[in-house]
Amino acid sequence: MAESRPELRLLQLVPEPLPTHRPDVRVLFGDILPQHGILCDLIGRPGDTPEGGRLRREFSFFMLCLRQLLAANRRQYFAVQVRDMALLGVVARIICAFKGMPLFYWMSFLFAESRIVRAASADEPLGRLRRIALAVYGRLEHFALYRLVLPACRHVFVQSSAMARHVAVHGVPEDKMTAVPMGVDLDRILDPAIVAQRLPQWPDQPVIAYLGSLDTLRRLDALIDMLKILHQRGRENVRLLLIGDGSCAADTDFLREQARQSGLEQAMHITGWLPGAQAWALLKGADIAISPIPRGPLLDVSSPTKLLEYLALGMPCIGNDSPDQAEVLKASGAGLLCRLTPTELAERAIELLDNLPAARVRAASGLDYIRQQRSYSVLGARLAAVYRRLAGESA
């Protein structure tokens, strides 16, 4: 144990299937916090595919959470924490109030706002009934979260200081919130067994890599437009590697069609979803990495992981002025910052590709920054201190 203090145990309800690949759940609560005497009982959906329809599975998960909440008590847990489930948070509020147990809420994304935006967007391929259902659910979730759950919580954990400001607009005091940004699991990403790998069809071409979600919300067509500009400026040998997948086939179909219309089918490759080690190997084999985060109310409050992984690997990288990654790039000095326009992305890519040795020297400082500020070891120690303070206040 990293500390000799008494152990504290937290009951946390999460929407993810367990075991989960999400490092902010798996690493923080499964590996790091126990080293500081903070133990967590995680309640999530089954990791395999259970029998029955979706409604039956959702009801089964709800009943599992309800049973755990009803069985919980102050002798066993110092608090209950609900992650990203506003409607279940209402139930937890009632039960915790009855039992005199502190309730925490963890917000990793603005899910209610996202559903409202998607329902109103003409870009979303939704039928009329599904669009109405999504809008109604989003509004209901928004009301439950900001009117019923968060005001009753002892503490709220958010992804960024920008998200804290967003939540504060709805009446939650900022001193009642703690920002826990995304981090990097350095033990995994720096595994010596992960060796740089290049696609066989691009053995010598300069490769720009992107690692992450390919959802339409990410507006990755800007990268295809960037690639088109690079080719127009005499960089016909530059290739674009998209490491990841979309939520549905329409996301990747859209990107492939954009590339086809621009005559870039052979200059772009989508890997689909890959295990972490395989994805990092391809990333390490690229020449530069890029992290475009569209600006807007939803993603401006996010804490992107991809840029942090680029820095941990010492990759020459480009990131746009999304608040969290702009802060990271300015503080680390390890990459280039620009606005999210195809022209500026292309200009920064040329700047790096024309002087890769200097870019690699600058990028090497990224790992030190991650170790000091954004490793899960550091974030976990800070989070453990917050939990101990909260446990002391509620004792």
Predicted feature residues:
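Conserved donor-binding/catalytic core segment of Leloir-type glycosyltransferases
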Residues: 200-227, 241
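A short, well-ordered alpha-helix in the C-terminal region of glycosyltransferases
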Residues: 351, 358-373, 384-385
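Conserved acidic donor-binding segment of nucleotide-sugar-dependent glycosyltransferases
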Residues: 331-343, 351-357
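Short N-terminal targeting/anchoring amphipathic segment
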Residues: 70-88, 99-105
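Nucleotide-sugar-dependent
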Residues: 20, 218, 277-281, 289-308, ...
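Nucleotide-activated donor-binding/catalytic signature segment of Leloir-type glycosyltransferases, i.e.
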Residues: 243-244, 252-281
